[in-house]
C-alpha cells in the first residue's frame, strides 16, 4: 500500500538532499527532534512553522552552520558530513539569508564573483570577471549594471545579485530564508518568476515564509514543524486553516481578536505637526481604550509621523500632548517619561540591542528610572523582567540568553515587554507583526487588547490592510505626507482605504507605491 508521503512524491525525481531523523540540542534545550526532510530537483519545498519551531536551525544544518547531534544528512543518496558552509557550497548548497551577504561598496560583478575573482599574472582579470558575472545574471534573466555599486541598488535587485552569486558557484540547492520580507508586491512577482525559471532548470529549493498565500503560489509541497518536531508534509495548496492548525496545534477561530474596551478621554493629541519634506499639518487624537490605525502607501509619511511623535526625529512646528501635557519635540527621554512607548518598523536595527541579553533589552527604558543612588537595581530589574517575560510568554532558555538567539516573534514580544515594564500608556506601533507567524501575531494582538482594556491608547502603522481593518477602531489614511481622511474600521473595505491613500499622490508616485496599488487590486 502507498502511504500519503509516497503518493505525494510518486512522480517526483529522487531527492538530492535528505535530512534523515536529525536532532539538535543547545544545552538542555532540544531544538530539533528526529526531523526528516527531502529536497528534490526542480521542486520547491516550503518550510512552515511558528517562530521558534526550528526552521532556522534546520536550514543551518542543511548549509553547514550547525551539525546534527543525531541522525544523518545525505547528498545524492550518500551519507555526508557538512562541517562548515564551504563544504556545503562544494555540494552545491547555497543559502539566501534575510540579511544579504554582499559588500555594498563593491560592484555587482565583484559581488557575484566574491571570493572567486579570476586573475591573470596575479592581477584581477576584470574582463573575465564581468563575463562570468553576466553569465550568472543571464541564468535568471535579470538586467543589472555590472559596474553599479551594490549599495546603490534596492533590496530586490541586491537579492537577485545574491541568487546570481549562488548560481555562479553551481548551486543545485537554494535555501530561501524569508526572501519576500522586505519586497513590494511587484518585486515578489519578479522573484517568483526567477524561482519558476530555476525550477525548470532543475534547481531544488527550500522556501521559508510566514505568508501562506506565497507558499500556495510558489511551493510544490510544504513540511510543517512544531516545537522542533516534524508534523506533516502536504501539497502546498492545502487549505490555509488546516496549515495554521498543524503549525500552532490548535484552530485559530479569529485571526484579528479585537476586544471592545470602553473608549475614554484623549490620551494622545497631535496638533498641526509639520516637518518639511516629510509630512504636513498632521493632527490626530487617540483616546484611552482605542486603537487608531495609520494606513497609506509606501512613502506616505506614516513612519516619519510616528518617529516624530516618539521624539526620535525633530519637527519644524506643531504640538504633541500626552494626557494633557505638552511634550518637548525631538526628545525621546521626555516622551518615555510621559508614557510613550515606540516599537519601530525594523526591530533588529532600531528596536533591539542584539548583542545583549533578553533581560537587558526588556529593561532598556527603565534602567535609569529604577536606579538607586545612581546604581542600577539589578535584582529588582531581574524580578520585573522575569514577570513580564512570563506574562507575555516569551520563549527563551533564560533571561540571560542573547536576544539575537530568539525567534522573530519572541524578539518582538520582548520589545513590547520593554514598554509594559516601563508602564507606558501610549503605544506607537510601526509594523508590529512584520516577520512573525500567525500564532505570534495573535499573541501580539492580545497584548494590544490587554493594554487598551487597561485604558491605554495605541496608534498603529501597518502595511497589511486586513490587520488595520481587523484591529483598529478608526483608520486615518495618509497620502502625500498629509492625512487624507478618516474611516471607521467597521464596514470599511480595502477599496475605501486605497481610494484615500492615492488621493494626494501625484505623477511622482514611487514604484513601491504603484506595486501596493496593484497588489490590493489582485487581493480583491
From Swiss-Prot:
UniProt GO MF annotations: ABC-type D-ribose transporter activity; ATP binding; ATP hydrolysis activity
SUPFAM superfamilies: P-loop containing nucleoside triphosphate hydrolases
SMART domains (alphabetical): AAA (SM00382)
Residues annotated for ATP binding in this entry: 49-56
Subcellular location: Cell membrane
GO cellular component, one term: plasma membrane
Pfam families: ABC_tran
Reactions accelerated catalytically: D-ribose(out) + ATP + H2O = D-ribose(in) + ADP + phosphate + H(+)
Entry EC number(s): 7.5.2.7
UniProt KW Coiled coil keyword: no
Primary localisation category: membrane
PROSITE patterns registered for this protein in UniProt: ABC_TRANSPORTER_1, ABC_TRANSPORTER_2, RBSA
This protein's UniProt keywords: ATP-binding, Cell membrane, Membrane, Nucleotide-binding, Repeat, Sugar transport, Translocase, Transport
The keyword Nucleotide-binding belongs to this UniProt entry's keyword annotation: yes
Bilayer topology annotation: Peripheral membrane protein
Residue ranges of every copy of the ABC transporter domain listed in the record: 17-252, 263-505
Enzyme class: translocase
Known role: Part of the ABC transporter complex RbsABC involved in ribose import. Responsible for energy coupling to the transport system.
Family statement drawn from the similarity comment of this UniProt entry: Belongs to the ABC transporter superfamily. Ribose importer (TC 3.A.1.2.1) family.
Subunit text: The complex is composed of an ATP-binding protein (RbsA), two transmembrane proteins (RbsC) and a solute-binding protein (RbsB).
PANTHER family per record: CARBOHYDRATE TRANSPORT ATP-BINDING PROTEIN MG119-RELATED, GALACTOFURANOSE TRANSPORTER ATP-BINDING PROTEIN YTFR
UniProt-recorded name of the protein: Ribose import ATP-binding protein RbsA
Organism: Corynebacterium glutamicum (strain ATCC 13032 / DSM 20300 / JCM 1318 / BCRC 11384 / CCUG 27702 / LMG 3730 / NBRC 12168 / NCIMB 10025 / NRRL B-2784 / 534)
